[in-house]
Every structure is written in structure tokens, then in C-alpha cells.
Amino acid sequence: MKILRFDHMHVKPENYDAFVGNLQKLIGHDVLMNMPMPEYGLQVAYEPFPVGLEAFKPVAESNDSYTFRNATTEKGIFSIAFKVENLAEATAEMEAKGWKKLEEYPNGPIQEALFDTKKDFGFYMELIEYPFDTLAEMFALAAQASQAGQAPQC
């Protein structure tokens, strides 16, 4: 498995709205993304700079992702995501090392998988693969396409 770099972390804050407001005050602008993600039963805020930070709040009891995240009562850092060269190979290696895959998130060009590494590392580990240098680059391309009235070519 080739880990390319630290990509982002997921945080389950005590108070989602206060966390997002304080983060925006800290960085001096609105977070890049703050929106419901009904397919995962979550409200999600994402900011790629200076370090990728994704906060989430479980909001709908309609799926396994909600159930899993809501059952985790601990607040704070939930998982750390590492960008990998090949998610399929990395997943096979993680499972061979005994870390169970908990979820997969296929989202267009972004492919993610979450593993149960909490006992060994103190947090869950997510591996992510995408064809851009950074997620910020992908969001910028999507924004340009949206402004031009086109579908994003991610």
C-alpha cells in the first residue's frame, strides 16, 4: 500500500453549529462546503485549508452510516484520512492486516473506505483515492463548471 500523504480528518464536535462558526472565525471566511448529505444521514462541513477538516453531525436515521456514527458517543477527532495511490489494493492490505472495512463511499471520482483501527490507533482510519492533487483542486474545478453552467468534469 502506498500512502501518498495525510489528506484530512473528520471531527464529531460537541456542538456542530458552534464548531463551524468558530472555524469560520478562525480562518476568516466561510467553509468551502456546509451542506446536508442525506445519502449518509449527515450534515457535513468541509474546509481544505490549512489542513483538510471535515465536521459532521448525524441528522437522519435512514442508513447504516448514520447508525454507525451516531452510536459513537465520543466527540472530537473521529477519523484521519490518508490519500492512497490505489484504494482497492490498500483495502485488501488493510483487511489482510486485520482492520475491518466499516464503510465505503464511492462518490464519482472520489473513492473512500473507513476502517476499524480505533483500538490500535485511537481513531478510525479512512483511505481515499482521487485523480487530483488535492480535494481543494477538485472543488475549484467543480465551482468553475458550476459558474459556467456546466456539469463538473471531475
Where would I find each of the regions flagged by the language model?
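Vicinal oxygen chelate
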Residues: 1-2, 5-14, 44-50, 66-89, 91-154
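Context-gated lysine
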Residues: 2, 12, 25, 57, ...
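Conserved short beta-strand elements that form part of the metal-binding/catalytic scaffold
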Residues: 30-69, 111-135
